[in-house]
Amino acid sequence: MSAHPDDLFWQQILNMDPTELLSDDVISSTCDENTAAGTDIMQPLCVDMSVQPTTSGCHTGAMMSDSYFSNDTPDQNCQSHSTLTDLSPEDMNNQINVQPNQMTFQPISPPIQDQNYGYSNNMINPIKPASIIKLHGHSIGEMTVTDPSSHVNAQHFVQQSNPKFFLNMYPCMTANSQGPGECQSVHNQSSGSGSNSYDINTAPRDEWIFTTSGGESWVLKRNTPNPPNSRTNLIFNNAQPIFHTQPQVSGFSDCSYQGGGLNSREYVNLAGYTPVCNMQNIKNSWATQLGASIDCMTASPTGIDANVNSAFQPVGVVSNNRGANVSMGGMGNYIENNSPWNQYYKSEMANNSINVKESNVYGHVGCVNDAISDKQGGTANVPSSLLNPDHQDWMRMTGTNTHMLNNINTNTEMENYDFPENDGNVHGATGVDLSTLSNGQQHSAFEGNGTFPVVNTGNPRTTLNCAPQLFLLGGNPTIAHPMNGNNETPDKNVCKPTPSTGVIKKLNFDGVDRGGGIGNFPKLASFVAMREKMSNTVNPSCGTFLEQLEGLRQQNSFEKNISFADLHFSEEDDVLSSASSVSCNSNCDMKIEVSQQGITVSNLQQGFRQQMNMNSSVVKMDGSYKTQEMSNGCATDVTDNAGTIQQNKRIHSQNENPEDGQVREGGCSDVRNEPPRKSARIHNMKSEGVTCGMCMTAADSTRQDASGGSSSGTKNEYYDDESELTGLSDTDSDNEVQCCQEVTKVGPKTYSSENFNPEYRQAKRLLADIPYRRWIPDPVNMEDNDGPFIPIVTRPATVCMNGRRRRTFFRQCVTAFGPLSKLTYFKELLQSYVSKNNNSYLSISWPPKHGVYVMSEKKLGYEHIPTLKDKFPLPCGWMMVLGVVGAEPPAALNKNMVILLCENRWVLLHNYSNSTHELFLAASDLKQFMEEGLSRCDPIYEESTVPYGVAMENSLRDFLRNSRTFQDLMDQRDNMHGCNWTFNGMPGRLGDRVIHLCNPESVDSIPGDEAVVCEGRPLYFFAYVTTFKSNPATKATVLIAADKDLRIYGYHKGRPRIRYLCKNVKTFFKAGARKFYLDFQITPKRLLAVNEEEYLNTLQNAPCLLLKPSVFRNIYSQEGK
C-alpha cells in the first residue's frame, strides 16, 4: 500500500527550511500518492488533447480555445490594467499580493473509466478525479465535449472541431520565472516508481513552455506583471460570463446539462472593469488569498469528483471565485479552488438523477475586511477573529477530510453587509429554457426534479441563469451559503478563510503592523492544532502534522529546526499545558487524561490518532440522493430530496461508568430538520463514561443535577439554594445544542455536571480571549488614578459569560426597547408609554434571562425620588420610574431595584433594600442601556438567578458550600491552598483571568492576617487574581481578602489601594474584581472628595463595560495597547 498522502504532504513541507519555505523565490513541489507513479496522460475517447496559447492580447493568463466572441465583446472590454488609479475603493478592498510570475499545477490524477471509486476518510485510497491546469488562479483552458446527443437542448449545440481537455498534470508545484530563457527544474518527491523531472522554460512574449518527462510540451501564457511602485500589488481581472440564448450561435461550445435548461456559455478572463451587461457579472476575487505560492501546501485532498461511466455527458458548470470558471465536460473534472471563500461541489447528472460521490460544502459565508497583504513589507495582516475557537468546525457532509488550515475561521457581523437571506442553492429543472423566464421565475424554476447546487453568491432576485454568480455585497467579496436545503436559512456567522503563507514572512493577527505574532507556518500550524485539541476536534491532517513535527524535532539537529516550542504563548498560559489530553475512542466516548506535568506532543497526537472511522455511501434515488455518514455507534444521516437536508443525530450510544459499573443507555430521536447550530459542532467533553457530547450539554446536565437527576425537574436551572450550587456556569448558556436525549436514572448516580471536564470549560473561556492577547498584559497605574474609573482594558462581551449568545440577548433587547427608544425624549411621552405598557416585560442584554417590568410610580408606590436628589449628586431636571428589575417570567419581581430615567437621558438603578439607598449609573442613555444591561450594577450580582462567571466544578462547588462562615473560609483556604479556577467569565478587566486560593502563611508576597485594615475592619487574605495560571503571587493583579463579616475586598500593593467589592464569597464569583477598577456606584454627597460638578463630569465620561469586538479593537488599537 502506498504511503499516506497526508504523510507525504507534510514530510515534504517539513523537510524544507522555514526561511526557504517562506521565501519569495521558493520552488516547492508537493504531490500526493496519485501522482507518484508517473503514469502517462490518459486521453479519453473522442477527446483531442492539445493546448494552444492565448491569442487575444486582452486575456491575462487564461488559455482559451479557438472560439470567437459575438458582438465584439472582447474589443469593447479589453483594456490594460497598468496602474491602480482606475480601481475604485471597492475594487481595492480585500485584495492582497500574489506573485505575478507563478504557475501552479494541481496534483490530481485522472479517474479510470467505467470504475466507481469509494471514499474513505483516511484518504488511503482516495478517489482520483481529473486534473486541470491553473495559472495564477485562473483556468488555463476549457473543457468541452464532442457528442451533441448528450445534451438536453441538442438543437443549441454547435460542435467544435478541436475540443480541449487538460488531464493528469503530474506535479503540484509553484515556480517563479526570473527572466526570459531561464530554466528551472522541479522534482516530484512523492513515493512511487521514482522521481520525475519537469522542465519549465520561459519563452518569448512571456509564455511558459512546460515539458513533461514524456517530451510533450505545453505552451502557457503568463500573467502581466503587477503595477510597479504600489504598496499593495494588484492583478485585477474580471471573469466575464458570456451567455448565449439564441438557438443558433456559431463558434461556441454548448455546455448544457441534464436536469436544467442551461444553454451554451463560455467564460473569458478580461482585464480591467467588467462591462455593464444584462447579466450578473462574475467578480474575480482570486487575489483574496494570502499568497498563491503556497497553494500546494493547502491542497491536501479535500474533495472527490464525480465519475461518468461510458458516455461523455456534460455535468454542469463549476466555478471558483478567482476566475477559474470552467464548464464541466462529460469527464469528471476537478476545480481546485483555494480561495478564502470557497466551496466545492462535484456531481454527475444523468437521466434526471444525481450521483454524488462527494459534497464538500463546509464553506460558510463571511467577509474578512482586513486581509490585505503588504508585498514590500512581507506581512500578511489577518483579523484576530480568524482564531475564534467557538467556530472551529463547520457543517461537514459525507466524511469530508478537512485539512488543518481550513479549520481557521472567523465570526463576522454579516448583518453589516446586507447579505441576502437565501438558501444558497441553485436548482435545476428539466427542460426549462431559462432565457424565457423572468428573474423571479428563474429562481423558482430551479426547484425541479434533480437538484444541482452550485456556488451562488447572488441575490435570488437577480438573474441567476443557473450559473455561479459572484457579487460584491457591502463592498466585500462574499460567497454563498452552504447547501442547507431549499427553505432553510443557513448560519451566516461563520466564514472559512484558508490563509496561505507563500510569500508571507510573518502573520500579524488583528490586522495591525506590530512586532508580535506568529512568525512562520509551523507556529501557525502548531497553534491551530493546539486550539483544535482543546476544542475536541478530531482532525486527521493535524494529527499527521504533529507526528511529523515531533519526528522532525527528534531527528533533525540543524540550527533552524522547527520545534513545537516555537509556539509563543503556550509557555505562559499553562491552561493550555495543564488541561486534559483529549482523545476519542472507537465508541465515540470522550476520554480525559489529565497530565500535571504538562502536555507534550505525544499527548496531543493521541487526540488525533484515535479518529472516528467514517464511511460514505451514495445511493441513487428518483431525482434525489442520499448520503449516509457512519461514525461507529454514532450516526449522522444526511438526506437530500429536492434540496432539503435532514440531519438525524446519534441514534444510540452506550457507555460504562467506571465508578458504579452501570451501563447507561440513551436514545436520540429526530429533533429537527434544520442545519445544526454552530455550537452543535463542538462535542462537549465528558469524563467518567458519559455518552457522546452531541446528545447532552452542560445545561442539560446542570438542570438534571438541580432536579435530583430527573430530566423533568421543575427547579430553575440557575437556582441555587442551601443544598445545591448548580448550573450557574458561564458555559451552561453558551452550549446551544438542543437536548436530544432523555436521561434515565440508573442506580445511585445519574448524569450530572460533575461528569464534565472542568478544565476543558476553563480552557474554552481562556481560548475565547486569544484574539485579545495583545491587550491582556495591561498595566494598571495606581499612582496616577484614584477616582472611580481606572483606565483598563475591559473584557469584550464575547469573552464574558453567555458571550456566544449575547447577540441573541441583544437582539431581544433591541426588539423590546425599540418602541421606547424611538420616542422623543419628553417626560410626558415616556410616562404615557409606561402607563400604556404597564406590567410588560422588556428583555435586557445582560444578565441573561432578566429584564425590566414596566411599572409606574403610582402602581409601584415609589416615593424616593426627592430622597435621592437630596442624598446623591444628580443632574438637574426631572426623574421618572421606568420599572423594576426581575428575572424572565414567570418570576417574582424584585421591587427593591427600580430603573429610573433622568432628563439628561441617564439610566439609573436604585436599590433600597435593608433601609439603605444605593444608586448606580446603569447607562448614559437608553441605547447604551440596551448594550450594557445591568452589568454595572452591583446588586444584580447578589441575585440567585444571575449565573456565576466561573466554570462550575466539584472543587469550586465544595469551596462555595463550605465558605458560608468566616471560620469555614479560613479552613478552606488552608485545605485548598493552590487551587485555581478560570476567572474571566464576568464583565470586568481583561487581564483578570485566573483566581488562586492561598494561605498567606505559605506565600511571602501576600500580607498576613490583620496586617491590612479597612475602615477599622482587619482583613484576611485568601486568594489572588492573575492573568495566567502560571503566574506567581508576585505577579498578582489584585489580592482578595475578607473581613469577619465575609465582606470581600480588593487590595493592590503598588500604591496601597483597598476597595470594597461585594458582600460575600458567592457574589464575588459572579461579580469578580470589576468594582476595584470601575465603580459605577454614585457616591453620596457627604462622602464626595470633589465638588459635585466635577464628579458629575466624571460620571458622564464613564467608560463602557461590554464592548463589541469591533468596538473593542477600534478603541484600544487607537490607544496603542
Curated annotation (Swiss-Prot):
Keywords of this entry: Glycoprotein
Domain of life: Viruses
Residues covered by region (Disordered): 179-198, 649-684, 701-734
Known glycosylation sites: 188, 325, 351, 449, 561, 615, 838, 911, 914, 980
Biased composition (Polar residues): 701-715
Keyword Ribosomal protein carried by entry: no
Family, as annotated: Belongs to the herpesviridae US22 family.
Protein name: Uncharacterized protein U95
Natural source organism: Human herpesvirus 6A (strain Uganda-1102) (HHV-6 variant A)
Recorded name of the encoding gene: U95
